[in-house]
Curated annotation (Swiss-Prot):
Top-level taxon of the source organism: Bacteria
Catalytic activity, as annotated: a (3R)-hydroxyacyl-[ACP] = a (2E)-enoyl-[ACP] + H2O
Species classification: Bacteria, Pseudomonadati, Pseudomonadota, Betaproteobacteria, Burkholderiales
Underlying gene: fabZ
Active-site residues, as the UniProt record annotates them: H52
Biological processes, Gene Ontology terms: fatty acid biosynthetic process; lipid A biosynthetic process
EC number: 4.2.1.59
Protein's name in the database: 3-hydroxyacyl-[acyl-carrier-protein] dehydratase FabZ
Chief site of localization: cytoplasm
GO CC terms of this entry: cytoplasm; membrane
Origin species: Variovorax paradoxus (strain S110)
Molecular function in Gene Ontology: (3R)-hydroxyacyl-[acyl-carrier-protein] dehydratase activity
């Protein structure tokens, strides 16, 4: 079993996302064709905290899902031995069973755990969880599609 780690510089070479929408800071381990564990450090400097909510900042649930999808994209690229270029896009195709169990606040470290359930014909299905420490913050089944654009 070989695992892979990625720092932010390697992540920037693989994902097209940039501030304020890059939501993966580090990959702790990644097993080709199986799973990934990644981190998102949540700080008070996140732009979404200005309006969500000023009196009690909470990370929007949809951004937890997006963070899991970005981790899933990294896992897909690694599993398929793909280095994406400007013509490669990775889209959400579906989100099922999304559940939000605890708020994520400034100072929290979000651990993203994503496992491949199925990969076929450019469409992948994943089971994802986002945790703060040992507490489940969010879980969902994600489907993503990789496409080439011109």
């Amino acid at each position: 079993m070989t695992t892979t780690t990625l720092d932010i510089h390697q992540i920037l070479k693989l994902l097209p996302h940039r501030y304020p929408f890059l939501l993966v800071d580090r990959v702790l381990d990644m097993e080709k064709g199986k799973r990934i564990t990644a981190l998102k450090n949540v700080t008070m400097n996140e732009p979404f905290f200005n309006g969500h909510f000023p009196h009690r900042p909470v990370m929007p649930g949809v951004l937890m899902l997006e963070a899991m999808a970005q981790a899933a994209a990294l896992l897909s690229f690694h599993s398929l031995d793909i280095v994406p270029d400007d013509n490669t896009v990775y889209y959400f195709a579906a989100i099922d069973g999304a559940r939000f169990k605890r708020p994520v606040e400034p100072g929290d470290q979000l651990t993203l755990e994503v496992e491949i359930e199925r990969m076929k014909a450019g469409i992948s299905k994943f089971k994802g969880r986002a945790l703060v420490g040992s507490e489940l913050a969010c879980e969902a089944t994600l489907m993503c599609a990789m496409r080439q654009i011109n």
